[in-house]
Structure formats: C-alpha cells, structure tokens
C-alpha cells in the first residue's frame, strides 16, 4: 500500500524533493499530497492530489493541518510553513496516525529561528566562529551598534533577527549618492542616515546589526538523528548560479559542532560566509534548504533518506561524492490543471 506524503506551503524547488522521493532506490511507492495558497504554484503540478491552502490564523492553520492529515489519512507530513507551531502540536498529528518530519522540540526551533537567540545559544561552541553583532530595537541602539562595528574596522550590514533567507538584508554604505541607489543595480545598499530616519522614534522588532562578511558563502546540508550526524554536504556559491559540492573538512567539522550543541534531527542547513579565511555563521535552517536538490548530486538522496529515517529510525548512507560543479537552467512546465 502506498504511503501518503503531504507537503504544505513551500518553495518551488521542493518540486525536486517529490521527484527524488518518488524515484527512491528502494522502489517504495508514495502518493503525494500538496497544498499551496497560490493556484499557479508549480508544486501543485507535481502532486497526485492538490488543493488550495486557505489563509488562516495560526490556531486555525494548525486545526486545518490536523484535519487535512486525518481526512486524507496522511502517513508523513513534510512541513515547511509554520514549523514551530506544528512542532508544538506534534501529539495531535500522532493521534491521527501522521508522522511529522520536524524537530519535536518547539523551544529549540524557536531559538534556531531567531538569529539573536541562536547566536547566544552557540556563543561558547568550540570550533564555531560568530560574526561581531548587536541586536537592536531603536534608532539610537542602531547608531551605537553601527559606530562600534565601524571602530573595529568592519563594513556593516543588517537584517531582521527572525528573517528568512535574504529578506530584509542591507549593506550600509557611507557617503552614498541617492542617485546611485535609485539607478544602481543593487537594492541592498542603504545609507546610515536613511536607516536611522526610517526607524525614527519607533521600537521595532529585533534587528541584527553585524560585520559584513565579504568572502565565499556556503550552505551545509545535513541529515541527522538527535544522536548522530549521518550526512554532511558543503555547497559553495561559486558565482551566479554555479555551485560546487566541496570536501571542506573545516565546514564538516563546523556542522558537527553545531549538531553536537543543538541535536537537530532529520534535515537542517547551516549557512556560513568566510572573512579573512575564517568561516562565520550566518544562520541555521531547521528544515530542508531551498537548494537541497543540488546537494543530492553528491549521491545522497536527502529528501528520501529523511523520510526513511522518520519511518524506520535508521538509514545507510554512502560517502558523498564531492568535486561536483552544478548549475541549473530554466525549464518550461505546462500547468496541466488549475484549481
């Protein structure tokens, strides 16, 4: 009998996750359920059963998720949206017979999802380097943080402490010509005066003001149990869309140090960027990363192995193949049916 897997709202590259689970080497059959609030989402096109996901409050959304699992007899829930809230109600999913691919420790997920709390939790971790940073909520705090970082010789950037990916990321440029901002190619640069003016007298959500890291950036994709880190693939952003799966022992050791401290299970991703030859932490995603399918070119089928680990509690993984350069091109997909 086919196992039923549900993907709730997620990024479009999870389309590849479905393909990788569907073509698993064990020949197991799965039926894929996908929901998304946008009817044109490509994710809906790769589903056996697709539905439009409603816009709901958090309590209503959790109720919707539990009822969806019960109604469709979902065996495996592969969530991306509302991870923390789902983890808080994990027992409700288990009661309807659904296994959820998420860390069950909701407090840990909240910590990892907030960069300020995460950096505090990891500040004494051996082998892990953090950038110089401050958490601020007012324009005065921002100005002080900026000046202290400049005194250390750092170029300065900032982003929301609870932001995801590059949302809200800006680099502060001194003596910036407003015309350059208006007509230039980058919308990530901003003058310090403009930042302070925008914040004004407001008390805003936590902002992380930090040293700008100007060298190579890596995403480190990991598969683990709470006790063991099973697979690690560092993925280097070479240029543009070019990625390199790199046998980088320093980053492999860094991922081990993170796991030793946090004990995140299943899939997680560590993002770092180098400065002066030292890799420094940017963030940790306690879920499958958007570029995970590229790391699967190492021969490690991360999405399927995570599902197998959830179901059986154990997997065997061959050593990753490194030295793989990869990119991607656009491909047209005909929207065969619209909901």
What spans do the regions from the language model cover?
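A short catalytic or substrate-binding loop motif that flags glycine-/basic-rich loops and adjacent residues
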Residues: 150, 162-164, 212-216, 263-265
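Residues that mark the start of a beta-strand
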Residues: 2-6, 155, 208
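Short, charged, surface-exposed secondary-structure boundary motifs
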Residues: 43-44, 61-63, 108-116, 166-167, ...
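ATP-dependent carboxylate activation and anion-phosphoryl transfer catalytic cores
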Residues: 8, 72, 238-253, 257-339
């Amino acid at each position: 009998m086919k196992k039923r897997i549900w993907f709730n709202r997620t990024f479009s590259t999870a389309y590849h996750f479905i393909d990788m689970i569907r073509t698993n080497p064990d020949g197991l059959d799965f039926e894929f359920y996908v929901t998304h609030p946008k009817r044109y989402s490509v994710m809906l096109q790769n589903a056996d059963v697709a539905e439009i996901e409603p816009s709901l409050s958090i309590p209503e959304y959790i109720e919707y998720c539990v009822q969806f699992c019960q109604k469709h007899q979902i065996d495996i829930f592969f969530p991306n949206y509302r991870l923390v809230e789902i983890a808080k109600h994990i027992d409700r999913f288990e009661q309807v017979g659904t296994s959820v691919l998420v860390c069950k420790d909701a407090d840990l997920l909240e910590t990892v999802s907030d960069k300020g709390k995460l950096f505090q939790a990891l500040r004494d971790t051996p082998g892990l380097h953090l950038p110089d940073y401050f958490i601020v909520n007012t324009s005065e705090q921002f100005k002080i943080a900026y000046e202290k970082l400049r005194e250390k010789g750092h170029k300065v950037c900032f982003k929301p402490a609870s932001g995801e990916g590059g949302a809200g990321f800006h680099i502060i440029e001194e003596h910036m010509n407003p015309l350059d901002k208006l007509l230039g190619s980058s919308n990530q640069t901003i003058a310090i005066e403009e930042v302070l003016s925008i914040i004004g007298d407001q008390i805003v959500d936590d902002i992380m003001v930090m040293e700008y890291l100007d060298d190579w950036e890596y995403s480190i994709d990991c598969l683990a149990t709470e006790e063991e880190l099973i697979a690690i693939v560092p993925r280097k952003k070479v240029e543009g869309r070019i990625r390199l799966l790199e046998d980088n022992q320093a980053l492999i050791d860094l991922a081990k140090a993170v796991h030793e401290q946090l004990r995140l299970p299943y899939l997680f991703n560590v993002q770092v960027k180098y400065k002066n030859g030292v890799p420094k932490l940017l963030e940790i995603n306690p879920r499958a990363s958007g570029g995970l399918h590229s790391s699967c070119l190492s021969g490690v089928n991360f999405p399927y192995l995570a599902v197998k680990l959830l179901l059986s509690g154990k997997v065997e993984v061959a050593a990753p193949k490194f030295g793989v350069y990869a990119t991607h091109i656009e491909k047209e997909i005909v929207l065969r049916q619209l909901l």
